[in-house]
Amino acid sequence: MSRRSSFPVHLHGRSMLLVFVGGALGTAARALLSAAAPTVAVISVITFVINVIGAFVLGWLLESLALRGPDEGRRRDVRLFAGTGVLGGFTTYSAFAVDTDGLIVASNVGGGILYAAATIAIGAAAYLAGIALGAAIGCRRGVSA
């Protein structure tokens, strides 16, 4: 067994670099979109949109990669760079939490609960839709696990 293979993949320098660079790009994209988007009441609408889009794309990406074979080589690199890095940096749980807290602090507890529940439910639905799209495209191309 080589020294490199004895380390978990997340401790390999290449893996860390892929996640770091992807995360920087995803964070920059989110920052640019957030700066250009309006705030409604005390929440940033773009945070909701970014998180839903990110969930959808992550579902599609992971399903597409899974259908193409084991999580190794190029597929692993794509998952680490695009999934963990870009989409991890693009989506934002912290801004979602701040938006929810902002509604609650502004004495809109119901709005905070609704915003949180809607974000989670719609994000989960978007993720499942992304998986379905990845599976449908994979079936059309004749790709199977």
Curated annotation (Swiss-Prot):
This is Fluoride-specific ion channel FluC 2. HAMAP family: FluC (MF_00454). It catalyses: fluoride(in) = fluoride(out). Belongs to the fluoride channel Fluc/FEX (TC 1.A.43) family. Na(+) binds at residues 88, 91. Na(+) is not transported, but it plays an essential structural role and its presence is essential for fluoride channel function. Its main location: membrane. Keywords: Cell membrane, Ion channel, Ion transport, Membrane, Metal-binding, Sodium, Transmembrane, Transmembrane helix, Transport. Pfam families: CRCB. GO terms for molecular function: fluoride channel activity; metal ion binding. The gene is fluC2. It comes from Leifsonia xyli subsp. xyli (strain CTCB07). Fluoride-specific ion channel. Important for reducing fluoride concentration in the cell, thus reducing its toxicity. It is a multi-pass membrane protein. PANTHER family: FLUORIDE EXPORT PROTEIN 1-RELATED. GO terms for cellular component: plasma membrane. GO terms for biological process: cellular detoxification of fluoride. The chain crosses the membrane at residues 16-36, 42-62, 80-100, 113-133. Signal peptide: none annotated. It is found in: Cell membrane.
